[in-house]
């Protein structure tokens, strides 16, 4: 591509350990980033912004600590720190073009940060600032990138996903309270089963979200252990022994999250099990959301030829050829997001295995998939809460009609007349399209008043064993 540009003024010459290289005149990056741009024209997708911002935090913390340790002149460190914080604030996202499919250590992205920050800092000081010797002082891509993944993933989960889940849970609980007295037909194997209330059905969804929140919070505890200071392979070569611990303290202050210096930095570089675990929690959440979304789709199906228990908010025309058709578009989007997150987890699982000896070499892929999953889940959870749960309506006439004809209500008579006799009643009620109460009156010795009590759907939602002349026990 660059050979097509005839105007040499559009380039400048940059130098790295491999020699000279032409770089676009206005680019903040240098030779190593340019080499990566030319080496990896693969997907057209650059590293996630959250990851780039985490690199900014790390470089700011490193400059501050290196100055405190007397390893970096304070005026230089001040400018590096300021430039790095600008990167962390997202002011230079466009200057991080390196493809996600790059060197497995993420060195190209680390050097992208080093070069951009060095350029910005030099503009302020007018003094030479080297991306390796100064910005990357006391660091290696091998400890910086795993640290950046953990920071960015933690920020994404705590800042977006967990609040979204809390919001969804609150909306589900609010609707459950409002619909608590409405009884509906339960279903197992997609077939009619015993009754339950909408509050009980919604409560199961809420419990799934509660469990997802708990699992995520538990996993985050392990993500808070940062391997910064391990440098190349975990030994801490070419860094001050106090650098890692001190830098992590600064990172905690910058992000507002209590991070810790990993006790075993070899693990933090060579193994990414905690990141695979986080991906697994995303996977489990995706499964839960897919279940909830599919329940909503089934309950909304129809409105005439399906279950038709609820009516979801009409958000857009559903068909380009069938007038008046409205589809459950948000639940469908939830299903697609869940499918993608499950796919991401497969990629992260394979990537987690791809570390030989002292370094995992699929770190950019892990970073991309984790942060993409967190973003997708956080966004779609909010939509599910605000565009579906809040506005759904129960079609009580339809729910009551189906409930009254549900032959499975006869299950409550098992302790009194036996399973086989109850089955006869259920089959006859279904075959003759009659309420089970009518058929039970004809097929049993129980009087209608007693049968009405025993087959009361509301009472059946409370469980227990029902006997003649008494309630559930």
From Swiss-Prot:
PROSITE patterns (UniProt xref): FUMARATE_LYASES
Keyword Cytoplasm: yes
InterPro entries found in the cross-reference section: Fum_hydII, Fumarase/histidase_N, Fumarase_C_C, Fumarate_lyase_CS, Fumarate_lyase_fam, Fumarate_lyase_N, L-Aspartase-like
Sample GO molecular function, one term: fumarate hydratase activity
Active-site residues, as the UniProt record annotates them: 189, 319
Location of the protein in the cell: Cytoplasm
Subunit structure: Homotetramer.
Function: Involved in the TCA cycle. Catalyzes the stereospecific interconversion of fumarate to L-malate.
Further comment found in the protein's record: There are 2 substrate-binding sites: the catalytic A site, and the non-catalytic B site that may play a role in the transfer of substrate or product between the active site and the solvent. Alternatively, the B site may bind allosteric effectors.
Protein name from the UniProt record: Fumarate hydratase class II
